[in-house]
Amino acid sequence: MPETAYALAFDTANEVISIGLGRLNAAACAVEPVAAVEVAAHRASNTQLLVRVDALLREAGVERGQLACVCVGRGPGSFTGVRIAMATAKGAAQALGAALVGVSSLDVVAWHAWASGVRGRLAVVADAMRKEVYPVRYALDDAGVHRLEADRVVKAQVAAQELVDEASSATDRKSTRLNSSHQKISYA
């Protein structure tokens, strides 16, 4: 019987280190969650990441050699935090002979919403500091998550206005569709 294979995922793009471990289920093309931890690590990702990964693996009873995939959050986020995660993931994947996958931290939020049953339009916005944000819009339907734009940095006020304008436009389109599909009723 083949040894169980696992995927290790982590993200240090923000002030919280997120680490997850999943069992790979090739038959179902799925990853089954095994364990996860989030740790507040303000400017301490470099000293906390590997310690916390080792603890999670130990608690789950998983050996490093069972890791077939390393998945890393590639931001957007803290310049140093993203580089710590990327370098750690690349080194671990290379040392273990495991696959390496980079994932947008914003896409993870959208996929989590989708997996929780959210459908329709979704905006994910992350703080970029200095009154700027990383906004990305998505369409979530039964087929999955569809990213509608590339990563970018804009002033928070600009992103907020864009979202208000989009919501107003969607409301206007919906109103127009309703009006054109129903008879006009007048009271004289």
What function would you assign to each model-found segment?
Residues 14, 130, 182:
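Short, glycine/acidic-enriched loop or turn micro-motifs at the edges of active sites
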Residues 2-74:
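N-terminal beta-alpha supersecondary unit
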Residues 71-102:
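DPxDG-like acidic metal-binding loop motif
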Residues 56-60, 95, 113:
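Stable alpha-helical structural segments in soluble proteins, enriched in small hydrophobic residues
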Residues 10-13, 52-53, 74-75, 82, ...:
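Fold-independent oxyanion-binding glycine-rich loops
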Residues 48-52, 87, 91, 108:
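Short amphipathic alpha-helical face segments that pack within enzyme cores
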Residues 25-32, 38, 44, 99-177:
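Surface "functional belts" at beta-alpha junctions
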Residues 174, 178-188:
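Single conserved hydrophobic/aromatic residue that forms the stacking wall/gate
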